[in-house]
């Protein structure tokens, strides 16, 4: 194998590997506050930090062209001179074009990703606003229902208290009627007994008189007879 052929093989195996560049997605925080009847929404875009992919061959050109390859060449052609990687303008230009194309594709993917994230975030925010508005309206309805419920309870309590007072007064009146009847019955059955004695003394004569009065209600007696019958 000639030296020119070996140089061609070495140039074909040589690969230009551009220095790896780490790409970080800046954290983008989007905050929108829209207040409609105490409705507040806050959007935070999740932080995504993905390292740029790095591709490399199993062996670099210098490893392929190092001492190990030199030993095999020396056995074939008995050439002991050291070999090194050679920079070829055509391959370097191709590598630069590939790197530029890779950068453009990555930037396009990143831009599309950001647009998709913003679109989904905006859709989610609008959905959350709709749900929050529904919840707010339902809570307002619940508040009105609570107010009506409390009014009903208070009115029921007042009405019940009035009924309790009416019952109490009605039975108190019955108790008073019974007491009046008892007093009247006691007066009707009561017997009046009086002893009367009069003594008159004068210079001419002395006079003494006496009497007894017993009084009993005839009305009570007749009522007792009716009750017994």
Curated annotation (Swiss-Prot):
<feature type="region of interest" description="CAHS motif 2">
    <location>
        <begin position="161"/>
        <end position="179"/>
    </location>
</feature>
<feature type="compositionally biased region" description="Basic and acidic residues">
    <location>
        <begin position="219"/>
        <end position="229"/>
    </location>
</feature>
<feature type="region of interest" description="CAHS motif 1">
    <location>
        <begin position="124"/>
        <end position="142"/>
    </location>
</feature>
<feature type="region of interest" description="Disordered">
    <location>
        <begin position="202"/>
        <end position="229"/>
    </location>
</feature>
<protein>
    <recommendedName>
        <fullName>Cytosolic-abundant heat soluble protein 107838</fullName>
    </recommendedName>
</protein>
<keyword id="KW-0963">Cytoplasm</keyword>
<comment type="similarity">
    <text>Belongs to the Cytosolic-abundant heat soluble protein (CAHS) family.</text>
</comment>
<dbReference type="GO" id="GO:0009269">
    <property type="term" value="P:response to desiccation"/>
</dbReference>
<feature type="region of interest" description="Disordered">
    <location>
        <begin position="1"/>
        <end position="29"/>
    </location>
</feature>
<keyword id="KW-0346">Stress response</keyword>
<dbReference type="GO" id="GO:0005737">
    <property type="term" value="C:cytoplasm"/>
</dbReference>
<feature type="compositionally biased region" description="Polar residues">
    <location>
        <begin position="202"/>
        <end position="218"/>
    </location>
</feature>
<feature type="coiled-coil region">
    <location>
        <begin position="109"/>
        <end position="145"/>
    </location>
</feature>
<keyword id="KW-0175">Coiled coil</keyword>
<keyword id="KW-0677">Repeat</keyword>
<comment type="function">
    <text>CAHS proteins are cytosolic heat soluble proteins that seem to contribute to the anhydrobiosis in tardigrades, but their specific mechanisms are yet to be identified. It is possible that protection during anhydrobiosis might occur via the stabilization of vitrifying small molecules such as sugars, but not via the direct glass transition of CAHS proteins themselves.</text>
</comment>
